[in-house]
């Protein structure tokens, strides 16, 4: 009974994080289309600012315990690896894919992350994937494809660069799901997500120099940045990764496909985006994946 309650809690947290990502995507779309923001500028600002925010909150709650992770060399290296090869790598390769193709193509390719995780888990455990695990992966990827392209494969722009960076973003998404779990159990959300974003943001800021490409910071921009940084980054990653620490990387990555569902609904309601009938099938496939995972438990992963 207690295990089922904890599983439901993990599913809820993971879904809530994915929904926050979907909401923040609409704020990001507004900044790109109306305020002239670039992907490099927004990602560097969101990671660094959200990281600082979480570390401040963490210090208020935990004080000097916030730095305990650096007292153990192995854990400090894991945290640095999560920051660079998980958090930063996933974010950066996703937006580079968008640059070489479009958002729909990038979303579909990154949605292959559960496949990467399932392959890793099965190889590590020397087990074949179970039928419902394969069904969940296929359902989620197909659902994301339908939502991102409206069922038209010609809406995907698969240049060599887009394919390379898109697959890299799937590996990055798998990495931050897998790398975060042990650290979260030992140190909590504020330490892992806070330092992960802070270090990742520092590295990216050094590369893209966002201060050289500032956009006008009017009221609309600040409100949209609040949505991206607070709702879509600090809160979203904290909820999502806490959920992943409970349900596991494979299930978490599949539940995270709720993001495009939320993004399309919010875009249709507030940004005037068109809603097509084929999107309903995508909704059904993704929500069916969520239902399937709530009833079954995948292989032990992390």
Where do the protein language model's features map onto the residues?
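Hydrophobic transmembrane alpha-helices of multi-pass small-molecule transport proteins
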Residues: 54, 58, 129-151, 204, ...
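Transmembrane alpha-helices of multi-pass small-molecule transport proteins
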Residues: 35-88, 116-120, 171-179, 193-212, ...
């Amino acid at each position: 009974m207690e295990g089922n309650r904890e599983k439901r809690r993990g599913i809820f947290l993971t879904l809530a994080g994915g929904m926050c990502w979907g909401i923040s995507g609409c704020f990001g779309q507004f900044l790109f289309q109306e305020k002239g923001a670039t992907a490099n500028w927004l990602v560097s600002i969101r990671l660094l600012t959200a990281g600082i925010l979480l570390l401040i909150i963490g210090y208020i709650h935990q004080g000097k315990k916030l730095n305990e992770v650096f007292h153990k060399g192995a854990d400090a290296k894991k945290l640095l690896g999560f920051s660079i090869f998980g958090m930063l790598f996933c974010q950066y390769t996703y937006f580079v894919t968008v640059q070489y193709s479009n958002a729909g193509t990038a979303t579909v390719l990154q949605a292959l992350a559960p496949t990467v995780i399932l392959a890793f888990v099965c190889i590590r455990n020397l087990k074949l994937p179970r039928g419902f695990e394969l069904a969940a992966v296929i359902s989620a990827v197909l659902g994301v494809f339908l939502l991102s392209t409206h069922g038209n494969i010609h809406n995907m722009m698969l240049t060599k660069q887009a394919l390379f960076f898109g697959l890299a973003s799937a590996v990055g998404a798998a990495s931050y799901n897998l790398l975060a779990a042990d650290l979260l159990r030992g140190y909590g959300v504020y330490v892992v997500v806070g330092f992960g974003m802070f270090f990742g943001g520092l590295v990216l800021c050094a590369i893209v120099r966002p201060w050289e490409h500032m956009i006008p910071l009017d009221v609309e921009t600040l409100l949209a940045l609040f949505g991206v940084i607070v709702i879509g980054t600090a809160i979203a990653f904290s909820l999502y990764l806490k959920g992943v620490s409970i349900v596991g990387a494979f299930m978490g990555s599949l539940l995270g496909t709720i993001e495009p569902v939320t993004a399309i609904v919010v875009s249709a309601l507030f940004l005037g985006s068109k809603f097509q009938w084929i999107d309903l099938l995508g909704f059904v496939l993704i929500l069916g994946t969520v239902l399937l995972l709530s009833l079954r438990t995948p292989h032990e992963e992390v």
